[in-house]
Swiss-Prot record:
Protein EC: 6.3.4.5
The reaction(s) this protein catalyses: L-citrulline + L-aspartate + ATP = 2-(N(omega)-L-arginino)succinate + AMP + diphosphate + H(+)
Name of the protein in its database record: Argininosuccinate synthase
GO biological process, alphabetically ordered: argininosuccinate metabolic process; L-arginine biosynthetic process; urea cycle
Gene designation per UniProt: argG
CDD domains attached to this UniProt entry: ASS
Organism: Clostridium botulinum (strain Alaska E43 / Type E3)
Gene3D superfamilies found in the cross-reference section: Argininosuccinate synthetase, chain A, domain 2, HUPs, Single helix bin
Class of enzymatic activity (EC top level): ligase
Complex formation: Homotetramer.
Localization: Cytoplasm
Positions bound to L-aspartate: T120, N124, D125
Length: 407
């Protein structure tokens, strides 16, 4: 392979990126600069710099992207109501563009020849990373070892790491593929690859209790929203990162947001994963219910179509595109009145709306009551039905006329 002077590596400290450091040095005779995007992995970041240097990197950039991640990527996606295939809250999908953008920025500072990532050739993340890089530096060389090297499986990776004394925490028996950030934790591989197998939740779950271990009494919380963003929990104002952290703790305790799904990957195959998204699931539910109170019918119905498209764009790595940006502007406009307070009951994986209020509520008890009211003349419905049903009547009479002619 051609010699390179300096390569920027998207580094997590996991198995893939740990063995890529010696592989790059062996194959390109280059300096490797590791970059870790901190998007809320917490304890996974402990000792990362020491590990990267010990493995062969010249330095490690530890970039704290958590605030930007929550405010500029997570919250706009919540406002959009974007959920991929009805289940996946896009935990990995919207983290990759942000990290990819930062990789390009550091590559320019360092004068690097290439950017390298550890995504497999079967996954979605290779697309997300590389499209982000191309969006900010279309001429940057990208190295994707999984598409080049002789390593064919995670078992091969472990063997490679052991032969080069690369420190790893996993082994052949507990080799789940995981991705963690402040929004979620995903689990893939091993027994999960066969959809007939029930997930071993007591062994897999890290952020959440299983349903069986969740408290036998419900937990009540109150969330306050301003223009579509959660700003307070139980009456206490919080920044976005702190609020999500607190919801993760509360939701995890009550087994909220555990999803087992088979999804359609961008690259053409189906894959199965178990996702833990405790705080995010609470925010989605609260935001959606408050929108029901505050959005008019036409906006609400049209926004459902936008939500589906927005989810596809994010999942497919198209965050930095004119369409995603345009949809975000539309969504931002719809959120101007999504302000209010909602009380939620959390119990063994369930989230129940326990009451909500908003100064922009479009719900009128005077009009909606089943009791006697003085504002709604029910006789007006007759004229409405006559006009609304006119196309149906015209069509029915046309068929009646045709039947008479046939006779």
């Amino acid at each position: 392979m051609n010699k390179l002077n300096k390569v920027i590596l998207a580094y997590s400290g996991g198995l893939d990126t740990s063995i890529i450091i010696p592989w790059l040095k062996e194959n390109y005779n280059c300096e490797v600069i590791a970059v870790c995007g901190n998007v809320g992995q917490k304890d996974e970041l402990d000792g990362l710099e020491e590990k990267a240097i010990k493995t062969g990197a010249s330095k490690l950039y530890m970039e704290d992207l958590t605030k930007e991640f929550v405010e500029d990527y997570i919250f706009p996606t919540i406002q959009a109501g974007a959920i991929y295939e009805g289940k996946y809250l896009l935990g990995t999908s919207f983290a990759r563009p942000l990290i990819g953008k930062r990789l390009v920025e550091i590559a320019k500072v360092e004068g690097a020849d290439a950017i390298c990532h550890g995504c497999t050739g079967k996954g979605n993340d290779q697309v997300r990373f590389e499209l982000a890089v191309k969006a900010f530096d279309p001429d940057m060389k990208i190295i994707a070892p999984w598409r080049i090297w002789d390593i064919k499986s995670r078992e091969d990776e472990i063997t490679y790491a052991e032969a080069r004394n690369v420190p790893i925490k996993i082994n052949h028996e507990t080799n789940y593929s995981k991705d963690k950030n402040i929004w979620h934790l995903s689990h893939e591989g091993l027994d999960l690859e066969d959809p007939k197998n029930e997930p071993k939740y007591d062994e897999i779950l890290e952020l959440s209790n299983s349903l069986e271990k969740a408290p036998n009494e419900p937990t009540y919380i109150t969330l306050t929203f301003e223009k579509g963003n959660a700003v307070a929990l139980n009456g206490e104002k919080m920044d976005a990162v702190t609020l999500l952290d607190e919801l993760n703790k509360i939701g995890g305790k009550n087994a909220i947001g555990i999803t087992d799904m088979v999804e359609n990957r961008l690259v053409g195959m189906k894959s199965r994963g178990v996702y833990e998204t405790p705080g995010g699931t609470i925010l989605y539910k609260a935001h959606k219910d408050l929108e029901e109170l505050c959005l008019d019918k036409e906006t609400s119905h049209y926004k459902e179509q936008i939500s589906l498209k927005f989810a596809d764009l994010v999942y497919n790595g198209l965050w930095f595109t004119p369409l995603r940006e345009a949809l975000s502007e539309f969504i931002k406009k719809t959120q101007e009145t999504v302000t209010g307070e909602i009380k939620l009951k959390l119990y063994k994986g369930n989230i129940v709306n326990a009451g909500m209020t908003s100064p922009y509520s479009l719900y009128s008890e005077e009009y909606a009551t089943f009791g006697e009211d003085a504002v709604y003349n029910q006789n007006d419905s007759a004229g409405f039905i006559t006009l609304y049903g006119l196309p149906t009547v015209v069509k029915a009479k046309m068929y009646q006329s045709l039947k008479k002619e046939d006779k």
